[in-house]
Amino acid sequence: MQLLKSKRLMLLLITLASIFAFGVTTSLAQEKVKTKRKDYSVMVKYETFKVDDIEGHALNLYESRGVGVGSTGENAFISKGQSDLVKGNGTHQGYYKNTDKDGDVFFSKWQGKVSTTQSPEGKPIMKWEGTFSYVKGTGKWENIQGDGTYKGGFIARGIYVNYVESEYVIKK
């Protein structure tokens, strides 16, 4: 009889431990969110510094502002960056501050490559692509973690479009 009570108690404890462990494991699992958006942006500041070590080498500092539209809704953003280009080809990097319609913000850091070709009319066509990672968030974006890719290019003087895909989680 005592043995039967011990077995029942042990079975009850194992069951409770399993329920607790499963519940904790489930709550620790974070749902990954995949996003796609299209960013429209205008350069508002642009400064070039010629390096003069080789022909066409320049460092550029810039700021752009724009609107993103996609799977997470609409948002306004500011992007600040720099590029190191030789005849329009090279690298770029910077930071992105996104503010959604509720005023919540996330920041990301981006880096990539820039390439420039000539159109049949002889005009330069500048395109870029790269990666980014989320670095901080406020409000609903607090504890955001993840990364993504972007591709873009100028569509008119000082106006560009980026196609952005990402995956993120909000850590609890």
Regions found by a protein language model. Give the residues of each.
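Glycine-centered signal
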Residues: 3, 26-27
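Bacterial N-terminal signal peptides that target proteins for export
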Residues: 2-13
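Beta-strand-enriched cores of mature, soluble protein domains
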Residues: 28-172
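Bacterial N-terminal signal peptides
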Residues: 12-23
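Compositionally biased, low-structure terminal segments
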Residues: 5, 21-23, 78
